[in-house]
């Protein structure tokens, strides 16, 4: 959780992260963020936040028309009301609102900072 960035699949390779969206997306995985019992809590180290922010800037420069979002944001709108609510999420990750975080321009998300 030192913020190192590794490559699982190359950009252009089909991922296995969000059913129905794998062919046209790049998946990013943050290591950690879960409790010992396996519950998501979305807390990451300062180094991870900095690396994620930098990686997203690089990917956005390479793919300027791409939509940056979390797995949960690609869940179906089951009740058709135009809003994807927590009850409709197929996955919780990344356990924080990606759009709000990016709009805040706060590199380290203090609400989801792992405290040692």
Swiss-Prot record:
Pfam family, one: Amidase_2
GO biological process: peptidoglycan catabolic process
Residue runs in coiled coils: none
Domain N-acetylmuramoyl-L-alanine amidase stretches: 2-73
GO molecular function, a single term: N-acetylmuramoyl-L-alanine amidase activity
Family indicated by similarity: To phage T3 and T7 N-acetylmuramoyl-L-alanine amidases.
Protein name listed in UniProt: Uncharacterized protein HI_1494
Highest classification ranks of the organism: Bacteria, Pseudomonadati, Pseudomonadota, Gammaproteobacteria, Pasteurellales
């Amino acid at each position: 959780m030192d913020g190192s960035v590794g490559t699982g699949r190359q950009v252009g390779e089909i991922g296995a992260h969000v059913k129905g969206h794998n062919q046209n997306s790049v998946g990013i995985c943050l290591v950690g963020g879960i409790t010992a019992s396996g519950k998501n809590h979305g807390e990451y180290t300062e180094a991870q936040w900095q690396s994620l922010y930098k990686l997203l800037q690089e990917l956005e420069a390479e793919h300027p028309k791409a939509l940056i979002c979390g797995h949960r944001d690609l869940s179906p709108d089951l009740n058709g009301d135009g809003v994807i609510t927590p009850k409709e999420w197929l996955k919780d990750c990344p356990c924080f609102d990606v759009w709000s975080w990016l709009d805040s321009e706060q590199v380290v998300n203090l609400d989801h900072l792992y405290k040692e």
